Structures are given as C-alpha cells and as structure tokens.
C-alpha cells in the first residue's frame, strides 16, 4: 500500500542535509547512506548516492524516473545465484 499523499514524503534529516550541501557545492562525490527507507526527491537528481545493502555501499546515480521510490529498492540485499545443477547420472 502506498503512502498517503497528504502525509508527504519521508527522508531522514541527516540525508536531507547531506543532499543540500552536495547541491550547493555541486559535489560529484558519492553520498554514503544507510537510510534505505528514505524516499527519492527531485533535489537528488544527478547525484550519486552510495546505499548500504548490509555488506557494502552500492553506488546509484539518481535519475528522473526514480523519484517517489525508496532508496533501498535500488540496492538489492540478496544475491540469487541459481539452484545447483543436479547430477545427471542415470539411476
């Protein structure tokens, strides 16, 4: 279920501050964050944000299509490598 529009978007204050500083200084350095729950806002377009996936920070370039999504959607936490190949020897 989507968040109500009357509530507005959620973004952690420390991340919002880092985004404001990066926009003002036109910094190209990735912004490290552990806040996967924060929503992507229009101010973030063009920034690279390194989102923590539980093990490492995954760099993600924010584009216009990502607005309204959560940061965590773009840094997968699980790596599926497929099922093991069964031994094909006859029984």
Swiss-Prot record:
Keyword Ribonucleoprotein among record annotations: yes
GO BP annotation list: ribosomal small subunit assembly; translation
Pfam families in alphabetical order: Ribosomal_S19
Assigned GO CC terms: cytoplasm; small ribosomal subunit
Keyword line: Ribonucleoprotein, Ribosomal protein, RNA-binding, rRNA-binding
Taxonomic superkingdom: Bacteria
InterPro entries: Ribosomal_uS19, Ribosomal_uS19_bac-type, Ribosomal_uS19_CS, Ribosomal_uS19_SF
Matching SUPFAM superfamilies: Ribosomal protein S19
Gene Ontology MF, one: structural constituent of ribosome
Family to which the UniProt record says this protein belongs: Belongs to the universal ribosomal protein uS19 family.
General function of this protein: Protein S19 forms a complex with S13 that binds strongly to the 16S ribosomal RNA.
Protein name per its UniProtKB record: Small ribosomal subunit protein uS19
Species annotation: Dichelobacter nodosus (strain VCS1703A)
